[in-house]
Amino acid sequence: LSIFLLTRGLWLVLLEMLIITFGWRFDPGYHIIIMQVIWAIGISMILLSGLIWLPFPVILFIGFAILLGHNLLDKPEAENNNQLGLFWSIVHTPGGHYVLPIDKSHNVLFFYGFLSWTGIMILGYCFGSFYKKTVSREQRKKVFLAIGLAAVAAFVVLRFINGYGDRAPWSAQKNTALTIISFFNVTKYPPSLMYTLMTLGPSILFLAFFENMRGGFARFLITFGRVPFFYYLCHLFLIHALTLIAFFIAGYGANAITSEPFYFRPPEFGYPLWAVYAIWAGVILLLYPLCRWYDRYKSTHTHWALSYL
């Protein structure tokens, strides 16, 4: 497992630099190399490949320490306007991006740090112990209910009092809808403690209630869950291709292509929220047959490379 985590982590970092960067920009000259979530997950896998040799309680402690403690770094970052240099930026600093020049025409952009993802990945590794054969479904459901409810409750309480866990406090707005939006507007890049509790809490509750779910909808969800990275790569290129088509249909010319950091994305270009959701649903439906095929292919073939995609 350690070797697999190490090599897959390195593979993800390489893919982020070469394949995913191209998927975001369609720039064969690679004038900007984008380091986002996949590189952060890759670095986290590399770190986990060493941590798994430690005793399980130590691994669990490290995971919780990172998850619960990484927002302590928010204060020095805010006091220095997020300008603490390369190391700090690739480890934790949220918001904006850090530019690392390679030469006069090529740069690496670090959009957010890996630390919080490392904590989540460590706890995910520990979470897998609940799926051992020695743990019954009934036991697992009780534990998941307790964890999920505790996470949701912690989010509501800490967020309500604007306590620890997110650098963006909520505030009362001019109407109820905007106040609710402010309450749930937490930091995703990288995921804050509040974002993690808000998303993983309900997800764990979902696992508690729907482990025995069967039928077409269950197969639909499981298919994407079994080939998540394959879906990620496909959806990135498909959405960017659709963006390129929409760009020219909207009447933009070549002079608007080189908007930075993403090509074919001039500042005023876009659609209303309902259209964004419609496109999102359409992309999922379009990619489902392809993901279904790849899932079946992986299930019937044992080539080592398939475990890396």
Show which residues each predicted segment covers.
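Alpha-helical transmembrane segments and their immediate juxtamembrane cytosolic regions
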Residues: L1-L309
